[in-house]
Amino acid sequence: MKIIIPNINDKVHYIEDKQSIVLLGANGAGKTRMSVWIDENNPELNIHRISAQKSLNMPEYVRPTELRRAEDNFLYGTTYNDRDWLKSAGKKYNRWGDEPEIHMLNDFQPLMEFLMTENFEKSIEYRENHKDGNQEFDNETKLEKIKKIWEKVITHRKLIVCAGKIEVESKEGNTEKYNGNMMSDGERAIFHYIAEVVSAKDKS
C-alpha cells in the first residue's frame, strides 16, 4: 500500500508498506485535518475514517435491506452507481455533511442495517447449502465476529443476535435480557469501534 501524504518542502512524499500509522500531536496540531487530507487525496485506496466526535445512539430495531445499498449507506452515507463519485464527493457530502473535519459522525443506524442485512443474507446462504447436503459449509457473519471480540473485552456480558436487534444478558444469568440500545456508554463505544473495523472493506 502506498499512501500520499502532504508535501514537505514542495516535494511529494509517500508512506509505503506500513500496517499501522500513528499521528501524534497536541490538541489543534492538525491530526484530524491530516487524516481528512489523506482520505481525499488517495482516491484509489479504501479509506474508512472513524471520527472521535460521534453519536453512540444504537437503534432499538433495524430492518434488513438490499446488501449493496446497506453497505453503501454505511460507508458513504448514500448509494449511487458512479462508484468514483460515491467514494469522493458522495462520501464527503453525505457521510461527513460537507464538513469532514468537524462533522459529528452519526452512522450507528446504517451500520446496524448493514450488519443485519449481511447476517440475513448469509443465513439464507447457510440454509440453502445445508439443505443441499453441504454440511461442511460455513460462512461466519460480521455480527458473529463482532460478538466474539466484544465478549472477550466485556467478559461478564454476552450478546444475543436476534432478528432486527441485538440483546445483552449477563453470563451468570442473574439479570434479564435487555435491548442493545440500553448498553452502557462504554459497552456501546466498544461495540461501535469493533463493528466499524470489522465492517470496513478489506485492505482499508
Model-predicted segments: where are they?
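Conserved catalytic segments around the Walker B and adjacent sensor/switch elements
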Residues: E44-N57
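Post-Walker A alpha-helix
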Residues: M34-S35
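Phosphate-binding P-loop
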Residues: K11-K18, V197-K201
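Pre-Walker A adenine-sensing motif
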Residues: M1-I15
